């Protein structure tokens, strides 16, 4: 019996080992790849990864699964010439992997690597299924992301909350937005638009979010759930007798009402919300809340009391939880966060590459005191509206990050974040951003690009490298002070007019670069395309 017990324990150990998220990741990249690596997890007070060699095995070592996955990605890029990207998350690894000749270590003091904007869930991800989400979570882990917004299935939470408050199915569907508009609904900008949603939609999204959160937690990725910040349907005063304020209109859309923190039912409804969230997806350690987004009226609202009530409700649900807030336009209001304890709030400097609020005096959104005592994350927004086109500030993103890090505000800088409105574009910019935490010192843009091209295309080619340098000095060199919202848009998409200038309301059409440089760079890449036949990354670019 003792032998049988020991054998059983060994079998369990083998099953647990096989269930490692890193092994699963490797097998999804290339079947059989997990046999070519040794994975070692080592305790450390800081996030780190090491690349090493033991016999014929490449060793990836790190303090957690996300660090290890980041190390794996680093090895594939800079030792094998394999770049896993949105346009291709699978690759055929060499039968014999290139040996790590000298142990290589990278560590970071950037605790958080954030991902997603609310808008990403509507512009890009509204109809993703588990197959697509699984690839994205793998992409996150490979790029060191450990703090992503996770708002799929929040509509199911609200459905349950409002049902318990006495709302009918029809009334609930008048409040919950349709899939393509839930970003703005959850930012308190509108309600009901794009609905109603069928019952099957709620069930489908709840099931999907459970799988998403399960996989994130297997990696050790901390999901950021939408928290409760006072949003209620616009008719909550008439329906429930609540004391609410009217945040007004957002671009002509009626906003949900804001439940006053002094209303005795604020705590009750917040508790109900968190209870229903916990029931479906478990407790989170991070909650995103963004009341009064983009000009919401605060008339009649005690902002200090509101901030404290929102924080208190979240802490009652989970005493160690942290509020994640977006710095966008006037938010977060200083009066709302000024008296909150340090360590209880993280601020996402959402558009830090163009309109930083961390305390850079050169910014048009300059905040003299930055975010005060609160931790913050340096974010790159880059994409607006899901528009696809070449765009970026390659050199400036590097310079602004280290400028912030070296400033007095650097002591509260705790990470980097991707806050694009639309995903799956301009991979070079996001590759750069996600490497920043692992590079302790400022580095040369051109040298980084040369190494990037080798990683992305699998071999060195001077013509391709020169093409990318040309792009980095033209279309990827948007001026530092330029605040345009993403890529240029084609005037062929504009409403017909005698003198078309803009496509969308906030687009910028004036060239900041010479279009001939982009044409030359494209011609250079085409001239050597035959050398890269079958390389999906070059074909995509």
Q: Residue ranges of each PLM-predicted region?
A:
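Catalytic-core regions of glycoside hydrolase
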Residues: 83, 87-97, 116-120, 141, ...
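Short, hydrophobic/amphipathic alpha-helical patches that form generic packing surfaces
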Residues: 27-28, 70-79, 142-143, 427-438, ...
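Second-shell loop/turn segments in exported
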Residues: 57-62, 122-127, 199-200
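Contiguous, structured surface segment used for ligand recognition
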Residues: 18-110
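Acidic, low-complexity N-terminal propeptides/linkers enriched in Ser/Thr/Asp/Gly that mediate export
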Residues: 497-541
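Bacterial Sec-dependent N-terminal signal peptides
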Residues: 1-20
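Short, polar loop/linker segments at the starts of domains and inter-domain junctions
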Residues: 48-50, 126-135
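Active-site-adjacent substrate/metal-binding segments within catalytic domains
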Residues: 110-129, 140
């Amino acid at each position: 019996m003792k032998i049988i017990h020991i054998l059983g324990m060994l079998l369990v150990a083998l099953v647990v080992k096989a269930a490692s998220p890193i092994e699963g990741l490797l097998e999804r990249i290339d079947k059989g790849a997990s046999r070519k690596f040794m994975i070692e997890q080592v305790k450390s007070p800081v996030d780190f990864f090491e690349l090493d060699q033991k016999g014929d095995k490449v060793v990836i070592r790190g303090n957690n699964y996300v660090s290890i996955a980041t190390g794996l990605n680093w090895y594939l890029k800079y030792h094998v010439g394999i770049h896993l990207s949105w346009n291709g998350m699978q690759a055929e690894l060499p039968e014999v992997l290139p040996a790590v000749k000298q142990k290589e270590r990278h560590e970071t003091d950037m605790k958080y690597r954030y991902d997603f904007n609310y808008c990403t869930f509507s512009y890009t991800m509204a109809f993703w299924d588990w197959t697509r989400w699984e690839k994205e979570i793998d992409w996150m882990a490979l790029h060191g992301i450990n703090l992503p917004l996770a708002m799929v299935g929040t509509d199911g939470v609200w459905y349950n909350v409002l049902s318990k408050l006495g709302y009918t199915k029809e009334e609930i569907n008048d409040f919950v937005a349709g899939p393509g508009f839930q970003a703005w609904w959850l930012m308190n900008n509108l309600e009901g638009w794009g609905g109603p949603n069928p019952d099957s939609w709620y069930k489908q999204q709840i099931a999907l979010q459970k799988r998403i959160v399960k996989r994130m937690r297997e990696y050790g990725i901390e999901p950021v759930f939408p928290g409760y910040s006072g949003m209620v349907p616009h008719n909550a005063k008439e329906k429930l007798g609540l004391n609410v304020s009217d945040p007004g209109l957002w671009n002509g859309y009626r906003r949900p009402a804001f439940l006053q923190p002094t209303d005795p039912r604020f705590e009750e409804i917040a508790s109900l919300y968190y209870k229903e969230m916990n029931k479906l997806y478990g407790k989170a350690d991070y909650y995103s809340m963004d009341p009064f987004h983009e000009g919401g009226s605060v008339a009649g609202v005690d902002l200090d009391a509101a901030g404290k009530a929102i924080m208190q409700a979240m802490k009652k649900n989970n005493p160690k939880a942290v509020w994640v807030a977006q710095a966008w336009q006037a938010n977060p209001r200083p009066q709302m966060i000024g008296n909150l304890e340090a360590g209880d709030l993280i601020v996402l400097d959402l558009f830090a590459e163009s309109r930083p609020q961390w305390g850079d005096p050169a910014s048009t959104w300059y905040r003299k005191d930055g975010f005060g005592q609160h931790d913050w994350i340096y974010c790159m927004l880059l994409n607006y509206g899901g528009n696809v086109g070449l765009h970026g500030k390659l050199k400036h993103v590097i310079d602004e990050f280290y400028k912030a890090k070296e400033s007095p505000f650097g002591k509260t800088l705790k990470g980097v974040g991707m806050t694009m409105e639309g995903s799956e574009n301009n991979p070079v910019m996001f590759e750069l951003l996600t490497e920043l935490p692992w590079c302790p010192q400022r580095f040369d843009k051109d040298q980084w690009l040369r190494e990037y091209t080798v990683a992305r295309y699998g071999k060195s080619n001077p013509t391709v490298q020169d093409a990318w340098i040309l792009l980095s000095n033209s279309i990827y060199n948007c001026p530092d002070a330029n605040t345009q919202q993403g890529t240029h848009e084609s005037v062929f998409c504009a409403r017909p007019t005698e003198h078309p200038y803009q496509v969308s309301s906030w687009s910028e059409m004036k060239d900041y670069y010479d279009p001939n440089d982009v044409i030359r760079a494209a011609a250079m890449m085409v001239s050597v395309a035959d050398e890269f036949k079958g390389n999906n990354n070059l074909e995509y670019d």
